[in-house]
Curated annotation (Swiss-Prot):
Subunit structure: Homopentamer.
One annotated Gene Ontology cellular component of this protein: plasma membrane
Organism: Mannheimia succiniciproducens (strain KCTC 0769BP / MBEL55E)
Record protein name field: Large-conductance mechanosensitive channel
Annotated compartments: Cell inner membrane
Family membership: Belongs to the MscL family.
SUPFAM superfamilies: Gated mechanosensitive channel
GO MF, any single term: mechanosensitive monoatomic ion channel activity
Segments crossing the lipid bilayer: 10-30, 76-96
Domain of life: Bacteria
PANTHER family: LARGE-CONDUCTANCE MECHANOSENSITIVE CHANNEL, MECHANOSENSITIVE CHANNEL MSCL
Length: 128
């Protein structure tokens, strides 16, 4: 089998195509959620906390010296990313929960006779 034919078969398998679509949609969804958090949620939260802009919250570990920039710990951006994560995780949880509801429940295979019942049948057959 040629290399290209093998690659084509691999790429056209359902799982690979589904995963590629999921990654593309996930990337776009991540941008939407980041915009929601950065442009809608955080400004409202900033107003509720007295006009604080979370993007600017930071601890200065070392001041800027000459051309060397300051060393900062940007905890405001971290808080914003935590909000991003929580919203994305909740949305994925809700999608998985919805998909699981749509799946048909797996029917259990009919239970066969127990070992004791089989042994009793064998015993009865041997008595004949």
């Amino acid at each position: 089998m040629s290399f290209m034919k093998e690659f084509r078969e691999f790429a056209m398998r359902g799982n690979v195509v589904d995963m590629a679509v999921g990654v593309i949609i996930g990337g776009a969804f991540g941008k939407i959620v980041s915009s929601l958090v950065g442009d809608v949620v955080m400004p409202v939260l900033g107003i509720l906390t007295g006009g604080v802009d979370f993007k600017d919250l930071k601890f200065v570990l070392a001041e800027a010296v000459g051309e060397t920039p300051a060393v900062t710990l940007n905890y405001g951006l971290f808080i914003q990313n935590v909000f991003d994560f929580i919203i994305i995780a909740f949305a994925i949880f809700m999608m998985v929960k919805g998909i699981n509801k749509l799946k048909k429940p797996v029917e259990e295979a009919p239970k066969g006779p127990t070992s004791e019942e089989l042994l009793s049948e064998i015993r009865d057959l041997l008595k004949k």
